[in-house]
A protein has these predicted regions:
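Beta-lactam-recognizing serine transpeptidase/beta-lactamase-like catalytic domain environment
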Residues: 1-203
Length: 203
């Protein structure tokens, strides 16, 4: 059946995301073989994700930031995995930056450890004089329209606040309104015993 972009978010439709990714690659589902996917198509998807902070440095004011792991195969099936977040890996901070970029209408803002620096308190009860205030740093603005973001906001709200939403059962009794997107974390399991290469169980 045909579903809208909002319902695709609400129900976490992999098929919708697959078809969208194939359109990005110039392939019409059902009429062409997906073997036409190229390495350039993978990069095009990653370039789009990077505008939201996925797979790149978030700009946090700490050294040695890890940017996740990019898959090195370019098989068509891996391209579809990439479309639903099941190929490249991302850090929790990257995921937070991506969601905040969607939430605020396209500004990707660098996260900071500090908001303000104050002088020592003179009375032990109130903050001392403000010495420095950390201003938000906008790293880039995505090229999506506000109308597109409005659709995203509605769809992500439906995930949490409608009976068919994939997160609704966890937030049905919440005293606040939430929005977002659910996902399935992958687990790598090598078995309960020590392997011949000296590795233990990894989850």
């Amino acid at each position: 059946s045909v579903i809208s972009d909002k319902v695709a978010l609400q129900k976490s439709s992999n098929v919708y995301m697959f078809k969208t990714a194939l359109k990005v690659a110039g392939i019409t589902y059902g009429q062409q073989s997906i073997n036409g996917v190229t390495a350039a198509d993978f990069q095009k998807m990653r370039n789009g994700y990077a505008r939201f902070g996925l797979g790149v440095e978030t700009g946090i004011d700490l050294p040695g930031e890890f940017t996740g792991v990019k898959g090195n195969e370019t098989l068509p099936g891996k391209y579809l995995d990439l479309a639903i977040g099941q190929y490249d890996t991302y850090t929790p901070l990257q995921l937070a930056q991506y969601v905040s970029t969607v939430a605020n209408g396209g500004d990707r803002i660098a996260p900071h450890i500090l908001k303000e620096i104050h002088e020592p308190s003179e009375n032990g009860k109130t903050l001392g004089r403000l010495d420095k205030e950390i201003e938000p740093t906008i790293l880039n603005h995505t090229n999506n329209t506000q109308a597109e973001y409005n659709q995203d906001h509605k769809g992500m709200s439906m995930v949490y606040n409608t009976p068919s939403g994939t997160a609704s059962k966890f937030f049905s009794d919440a005293k606040y309104k939430a929005a977002g997107k659910t996902g399935t974390a992958e687990v790598i399991y090598y078995g309960p015993k020590k392997e011949k290469y000296g590795t233990y169980s990894i989850t």
